[in-house]
C-alpha cells in the first residue's frame, strides 16, 4: 500500500490542525459553565456528555495527517483518565496550549530539541510545587467537596462521601444503572480481587469491555486446567441448571481456554475464567476466603479433591459478579454468615499475632475484602440519554475523589496551575531551553483562561487578576466571585492536576520534535457493484 509523506513545517502544521479541531471540541466543556457535546451513536439515541476522554475517543478526522494530531491528544486524555480517572479536559487544553506556543517558536527557527528540554524542566518544577502546595484529605466533608466539584452536583458529592465512609477509602464502589429516576446508595456484601478475564471474548458488555454474570455458580480451584474433559461433568451440570459459571483457577492452558471461548461465543453456555489471586500460601488463603464467602469448596489435592469428580454442591454461588480486564468483584456471596464471621475473627487474630508489617498489610487487605462489602451507587434518570451522561459524571467524580485521597488536593478552577508559575519562572536557562520553559509558563494559564471564556468573560483579564491574588485565591466561575478556593470547597485532586500536566507536556514535546509524518494514501471509492442477478441467457 502506497504511503503519503509530509515533512517539517508541513507535517507539524497538519498535525496541529488536528490537535486544534479536537481540543476546540473538548475545551467547551471545562469549568462550571462548560457546555455539553452531543455524540452520534451507530445505533440508538445520541450520547450527551461533558467527559473529555469520551469526546476525544469519538473524534475521527477525514484528513489522515490531521487525524494523527487529534489521536495524539486523545492519547493524552486517555492516559490521564487511566492514571487519575479525571482531568482529561484540562490535559487537552494544556496540550493545545503547549503545542500552539511551541510551534510558533519552532517555525521562527528555534531548535525543537532545546524546547523539549525546557518543557521537561518546567514540568518537573511545576509538579514539585504542586506537591508542596497539596493538602491531605482528612474529613468526610472534604471528600464530599471534591466529588461535588467533579460531578458539578452536591448531592452526588454527598453520596460518594457516604459510600467511601461506609466501605473505607480503599473499599469497592461500583456504579450501576437504576430502573427509577432517583440516584441511591446501597452497601452490599462483596469482595474484589485483582484478576480479570483471561480472554476478552468472554465480555458481555462490549462498550465497557466487562463481563457481568447474574446468579452464577463459581468453580474454585488451585489447579491448572489443561483439558476440557476435566471440567466437562460440572459444565454439563451448570448448563442443565441454565446458569452462568465463573471459573477461578491457577491457569487455563492448552485447548481448554479456546474451547470455553468458542462455546461462550456460540451461546452454548455463559462462562468467564479468571486466574486465582495471590501467590503460594496467600493464594490458598484467598481461595478459601472466596469459598467461604460464596458457600463453595476449594478443589485442591490437599483435600483429596479432583476436578473430574466435582459436583454442583461444591460450587460457590453469588447474586452478581462483575469482571473487568483487571478486577473481579463478587457481590452477595451465598456463604453462611456464621462461617464468614468466624473467618473474619480468625484473620483479626492473625493480624494481632503477626510481627511482619508486610503480612499484617496483606491480612488487613483480606479482612477489608471479607468484612467491608461493596458500595453500589444506583444512578437514576428520566431518559436513557440523561442516564448515560449522569453515569459518566459520577464515574469521573469517584475517580477524582480516590485520586484526592491518594495524593491530596490543591486549589481548583485552574488556580493551582497559575500558582506554580512563580516556581517555574525561577528557572533560568539559555536559548531554546528557556523558550521551552516560557512555553509551559504560558500554557499553565490556559485552563483558567478557558474556564473564564466558557463563563462568557475575557480570559486574559481573569488570568492577570489571578496573578495578583495570594496563593490559593481564585475566580469562582459558578458565582462570579473571587474567593479562597480551598475554603470555598473548590478543589482539584493533586494527582489529576499533576497527571494532566505531565501527559500534556510529554505528548506535546513529541509532536514538536516530529520532522516527518507517514500516512496511508486516501483510497478512491470503489465503483458501485452491479446488481445481483442471474447469468446471461437464464430465465
UniProtKB/Swiss-Prot annotation:
Keyword set for this entry?
ATP-binding, Chaperone, Cytoplasm, Isomerase, Nucleotide-binding
The EC number on file is 5.6.1.7
* SUPFAM superfamilies xref list: GroEL apical domain-like, GroEL equatorial domain-like, GroEL-intermediate domain like
Chief subcellular location equals: cytoplasm
In terms of InterPro entries, this protein maps to: Chaperonin_Cpn60_CS, Cpn60/GroEL, Cpn60/GroEL/TCP-1, GroEL-like_apical_dom_sf, GROEL-like_equatorial_sf, TCP-1-like_intermed_sf
Q: Which residues form a coiled coil?
A: none
Enzyme class per UniProt: isomerase
The positions annotated for binding ATP are 29-32, 86-90, 413, 476-478, 492
* Catalyzed chemical reaction(s): ATP + H2O + a folded polypeptide = ADP + phosphate + an unfolded polypeptide
Q: Does the keyword Chaperone apply?
A: yes
GO MF terms held by the record:
ATP binding; ATP-dependent protein folding chaperone; isomerase activity; unfolded protein binding
Please give the Pfam families that the UniProt record associates with this protein.
Cpn60_TCP1
Please state where this protein is localized.
Cytoplasm
Q: Which family does it belong to?
A: Belongs to the chaperonin (HSP60) family.
Functional note: Together with its co-chaperonin GroES, plays an essential role in assisting protein folding. The GroEL-GroES system forms a nano-cage that allows encapsulation of the non-native substrate proteins and provides a physical environment optimized to promote and accelerate protein folding.
Assembly information from the UniProt record: Forms a cylinder of 14 subunits composed of two heptameric rings stacked back-to-back. Interacts with the co-chaperonin GroES.
Protein's UniProt name: Chaperonin GroEL
* Species: Leuconostoc mesenteroides subsp. mesenteroides (strain ATCC 8293 / DSM 20343 / BCRC 11652 / CCM 1803 / JCM 6124 / NCDO 523 / NBRC 100496 / NCIMB 8023 / NCTC 12954 / NRRL B-1118 / 37Y)
Q: Which gene encodes it?
A: groEL
